[in-house]
């Protein structure tokens, strides 16, 4: 079995055109990483949850907290089946040593492989050392 996933919201509204979809407000989600006994916490103002495949889209004021890492952005797509988090739009990554700004961060929750990139190949990811 893989990771465990819990989604909480202050409000939820079922999509009448597709009852598998629930629109969420004031969302908090937890991804419990089985292999490492660690937790990724995701919060956002809004969410769109698929009750069949558990895929969730988070939007507006998205925050990821994982160990000493903090990532903020405006849009996050989480696929439990693919074990993939993709956060985009005004992405800022902070840890104890660096602040990084990019267009997109992709994180595989199983392998921890991370891709950080810009949409425009002529632009560069901005990295600043805190120390």
Label for each model-derived stretch:
Residues 1-131:
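Mature-chain termini and adjacent capping regions
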């Amino acid at each position: 079995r893989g990771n465990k996933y819990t989604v909480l919201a202050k409000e939820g509204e079922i999509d009448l055109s597709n009852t598998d979809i629930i629109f969420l407000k004031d969302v908090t989600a937890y991804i419990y990483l089985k292999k490492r006994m660690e937790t990724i916490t995701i919060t956002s103002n809004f969410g769109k949850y698929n009750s069949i495949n558990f895929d969730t889209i988070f939007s507006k004021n998205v925050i990821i907290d994982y160990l000493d890492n903090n990532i903020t952005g405006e849009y996050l797509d989480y696929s439990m089946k693919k074990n993939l988090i993709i956060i985009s739009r005004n992405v800022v990554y902070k840890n104890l040593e660096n602040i990084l700004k990019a267009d997109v961060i992709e994180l595989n929750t199983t392998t921890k492989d991370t891709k950080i990139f810009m949409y425009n190949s002529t632009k560069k990811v901005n990295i600043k050392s805190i120390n």
